[in-house]
């Protein structure tokens, strides 16, 4: 992030006045920088930072760097913090493609801890629409939180994927019989949820897909594009496991 900011600062300073007026550094971040929620409430642009993992701490530091380049050097920036993305083409180690592909292959489906950790799921095309609006119509120096109104526990997501697979691959043992509870991930935050009212009110964004429609589209994509996943397995050492901590 530091290198990108410095390169963009130098480039920005080299532009004429007209081109400077059209320049923006759009920093795309995560809701994990805000920490973990209790049973109620949602993250917003005014939520204090409380990162609880090495990953979220690094993302939080990059957010602060971006804002410091804005305040110190006048670099025009916009920051967006999004909830959990999903959709076609996502690398198989993430929860939704991992569960889908495990189900297709009739392999055990891992579910961390008690499966009750909650995430706010955002379909990738809805996220892209929000990013374009923020970049083209957002106010310089502002932050916009992007969430999909898709709060579900990991267990609920896994069961829904199993239900879709049962409908698409009938006459087999129900896919939920493949679920296997495994040791929880270190530092596994309990709940994330975003209040996207600012970007809705100020920029007119609304999710078009939502969780149910987006999840079905995603599972069907992996069913139809299984060869794409097989190529990933052939070209590397990845074998459908969660990566990182």
Please report, for each region that a protein language model flagged, where it lies by residue.
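N-terminal Rossmann-like NAD(P)+-binding domain of SDR-like oxidoreductases, especially those catalyzing
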Residues: 1-85, 125, 131, 217-245
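Active-site proximal helix/loop that lines the substrate pocket
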Residues: 30-33, 84-90, 116, 136, ...
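Short glycine-/acidic-enriched loop or helix-start segments at secondary-structure transitions
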Residues: 36-38, 89, 155-157
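A glycine/serine/threonine-rich, flexible loop-to-helix segment
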Residues: 41, 92-100
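Hydrophobic alpha-helix immediately C-terminal to the catalytic Tyr-X-X-X-Lys motif of short-chain
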Residues: 61, 65, 69, 99, ...
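Short coil/turn segments at alpha/beta junctions that flank glycine-rich nucleotide-binding fingerprints
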Residues: 72-76, 92-93, 138
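C-terminal substrate-binding subdomain of Rossmann-fold SDR/epimerase-dehydratase oxidoreductases
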Residues: 97, 103-245
